[in-house]
């Protein structure tokens, strides 16, 4: 059996809100597998779905830029928030986002593209910035969306400067209608995506592995009721329908008007746009998502320094 450390228990508690002893038991029952331990706690009714903790330990900025019917969102990381607030760093991220619009949006393509202000590649420009600012930084993620006819709306939540912040969203809308009205509903949908973090646009587009994991948890929860298998099957199907409604963009309650689903709000907007609207794509980047900084034990660090 894998050793269950205090750090593992702490991480599981932060992800699930479950008690320390429950977390320790869950890890022991699942041989230290964090994801399996989360499912074990959920199946026992002790914890809700893992929200990926919401912790954004990495510093830096998210930048968005658009040109015509194409837009990009990029994430550039730094070591400290102090550097993220630096004008030179902000100009760099804004510049990288503008360069990214002319590429296919992949990190590799953006890194290899020429940065106009330096005449060098984006990758080499970042290296120069590291030497100048004195702190490590990197282009971590980049996503591009485009449509042949329509708009790609952008949104930065709590912007620190024009096109820069810690959470950026793109939403691609296909339509032959009025572009100004289309961009207005696009921005509202982008704000909704920022708030709700949907997993997919439509229920059938939710990752099959994610859906199967939820189904297995619901089966275990339903079995605990002691009801017959045919009733359990109906219970699971009902819970899966609710799950898809909660994680698929178009079936979610629209945050700006909860009386409507997002699909209904988009349909309503077709009146102002003057043509049908299709939600063709979305991207949501939260700064530091999936990255954890190594936590420093300050007392241990001082003790080590004193010992030389």
Swiss-Prot record:
Transmembrane segments annotated in the record for this chain: none
InterPro entries in UniProt: EF-Ts_dimer_sf, Transl_elong_EFTs/EF1B, Transl_elong_EFTs/EF1B_dimer, Transl_elong_Ts_CS, UBA-like_sf
The organism's place on the tree of life at top rank: Bacteria
Presence of keyword Cytoplasm: yes
Predominant subcellular localization, coarse grouping: cytoplasm
Residues covered by region (Involved in Mg(2+) ion dislocation from EF-Tu): 80-83
UniProt-recorded Gene Ontology molecular function terms: translation elongation factor activity
Location relative to the cell: Cytoplasm
Pfam family, one: EF_TS
Keywords in alphabetical order: Cytoplasm, Elongation factor, Protein biosynthesis
One term under GO cellular component: cytoplasm
UniProt family annotation: Belongs to the EF-Ts family.
PANTHER family for this protein: ELONGATION FACTOR TS (PTHR11741), ELONGATION FACTOR TS, MITOCHONDRIAL (PTHR11741:SF0)
Function per UniProt: Associates with the EF-Tu.GDP complex and induces the exchange of GDP to GTP. It remains bound to the aminoacyl-tRNA.EF-Tu.GTP complex up to the GTP hydrolysis stage on the ribosome.
Protein name: Elongation factor Ts
Species, as recorded: Rhizobium etli (strain CIAT 652)
């Amino acid at each position: 059996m894998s050793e269950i450390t205090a750090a593992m228990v702490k991480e599981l508690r932060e992800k699930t809100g479950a008690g320390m002893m429950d977390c320790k038991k869950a890890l022991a029952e699942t041989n230290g597998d964090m994801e399996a331990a989360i499912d074990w706690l959920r199946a026992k009714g002790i914890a809700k779905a893992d929200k990926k903790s919401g912790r954004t330990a990495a510093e830096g900025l998210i930048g968005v830029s658009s040109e015509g019917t194409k837009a990009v969102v990029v994430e550039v990381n730094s070591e400290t928030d102090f550097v993220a607030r630096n004008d030179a760093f902000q100009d760099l991220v804004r510049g990288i986002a503008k360069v990214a619009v002319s590429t296919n949006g992949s990190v590799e393509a953006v890194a290899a593209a020429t940065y106009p202000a330096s005449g060098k590649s984006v990758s080499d420009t970042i290296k120069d910035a590291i030497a100048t600012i004195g702190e490590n930084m990197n282009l971590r993620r980049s996503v591009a969306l485009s449509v042949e006819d329509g708009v790609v709306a952008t949104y930065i939540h709590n912007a620190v400067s024009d096109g820069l912040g810690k959470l950026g969203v793109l939403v691609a809308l296909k339509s032959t209608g009025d572009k100004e009205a289309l961009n207005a509903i696009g921005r509202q949908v982008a704000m909704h995506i920022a708030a709700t973090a949907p997993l997919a646009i439509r229920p059938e587009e939710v990752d099959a592995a994610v859906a199967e994991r939820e189904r297995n948890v619901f089966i275990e929860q339903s079995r605990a009721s002691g009801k017959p298998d045919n009733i359990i099957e109906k219970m699971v199907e009902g819970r899966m329908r609710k799950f898809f409604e909660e994680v698929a963009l178009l079936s979610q309650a629209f945050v700006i008007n909860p009386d409507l689903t997002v699909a209904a709000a988009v349909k309503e907007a077709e009146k102002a746009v003057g043509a049908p609207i299709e939600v063709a794509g979305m991207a949501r980047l939260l700064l530091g998502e999936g990255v954890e900084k190594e936590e420093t034990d300050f007392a241990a660090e001082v003790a080590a320094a004193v010992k030389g």
